[in-house]
């Protein structure tokens, strides 16, 4: 809970100065700890995680906006989807993708666009090229834990694949996708 940082929900309501250190750390420390433990994530998801660490079961929309405004601007933020990256990581250089354990799932909206692109590139390389559908099926299964692709996950996978092509990390030949030569 947020007690590890000496912060409480009451601190938020009483105008807590997020930049001032408490006896155990600051809100910035909390944000950095979450990012270092879980990797980059969209700002909305990061704010929800911070709220949970402060003891909130649900994070209301006004509270969510309040927490998003307090995310340190010194962290790298991907302009494409607003994902926030751990200290020392830059969104345009980030090359990690985290697989899920069998039988578990990740919320599609908790994963940064950059990580989804990396997962697609990783799968494309391992398959030495494949159709969009084949690549996306493997990514949905291995990196998100989904056996089916609903419209929202499909939209995310399409956007990530298109970004991978635009970034020059993938080559498209019709519906067939190949890894770019590095």
What is each PLM-predicted segment?
Residues 1-182:
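C-terminal non-catalytic scaffold/interaction domains in large multidomain proteins
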């Amino acid at each position: 809970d947020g007690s590890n940082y000496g912060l409480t929900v009451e601190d938020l309501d009483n105008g807590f100065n997020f930049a001032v250190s408490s006896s155990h750390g600051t809100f910035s420390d909390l944000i950095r700890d979450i990012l270092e433990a879980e990797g980059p994530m969209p700002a909305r998801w990061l704010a929800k995680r911070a709220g949970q660490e402060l003891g909130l079961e649900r994070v209301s929309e006004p509270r969510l906006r309040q927490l998003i405004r307090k995310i340190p601007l010194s962290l790298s933020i991907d302009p494409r989807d607003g994902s926030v990256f751990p200290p020392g990581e830059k969104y345009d250089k980030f090359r990690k993708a985290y697989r899920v354990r069998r039988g578990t799932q990740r919320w599609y909206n908790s994963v940064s666009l950059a990580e989804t692109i990396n997962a697609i590139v990783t799968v494309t390389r391992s398959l030495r090229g494949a159709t969009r559908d084949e690549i996306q099926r493997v990514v949905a299964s291995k990196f998100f834990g989904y056996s089916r692709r609903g419209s929202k996950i499909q939209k995310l996978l399409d956007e990530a694949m298109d970004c991978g092509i635009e970034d020059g990390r993938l080559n498209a030949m019709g519906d067939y996708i190949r890894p770019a030569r590095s």
